[in-house]
Amino acid sequence: MAAGAVCRSCKVRVPKEVYEAAYVAGLLHDLGAIALTQWFPEESFAAHVAIREHGGTASAYELEMWGIEHGEVGGLLAERWSIPVSIQQAIMHHHQPWLVGPEHRTLVRVIHIADFICNNLGFGRDESVFPNWFDPEAWDALGLSIEDSQSIISQVRAAADKSIVLTKVLVQ
C-alpha cells in the first residue's frame, strides 16, 4: 500500500512495470527478516532487545550475528524461488538503493521510501528498531517534496485503516 502511494506521488514518470512490481516488492521486501526470525528466534529476539537498549540497526546486528543481513537473505530466497530480478533487487537493497544498477533503481527507491515511511508510522516489524533515516537521493530522484510526504502518509494511513476494517470483518 505504501509503495503504491509513493508511485502515485512521484513527479517523475514511473514506468508501468515498476508500478506493478512495487506492490509485490512492498509485500516481500522484509522476507529475509521473517526467515531469520523463524530460523533463529532467540537470537532475533536478543537483537531486538539490544537495539532498544543500545541503539543501532537491525541490519548491523544481523551482520554481527550471522554475517548477513535480512535484505541479502531475502534476495537470495527470492532468487531461489525465481521471483523476477527487479523484485529480487528491491528485496536485497531496500536499505541501500545506491547499490543497484540503473535498470532497477526506480523500483528499489520506491520500496526504500515506502519502507522508511511505514517504519516511521509504526507499521514495520518494530518501529523502535529502525532509525529515522532514508537516502535523500532516492527522495530527490523520484521528484518528491515535503508536501508529497504528507499526501503519502495520509494515503498509507487510510489504506491501513481499510485493512484493519477488512481484517475485522474477515475474522468475525
Show where each model-derived region lies.
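Metal-dependent nucleotide-binding catalytic modules
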Residues: 1-172
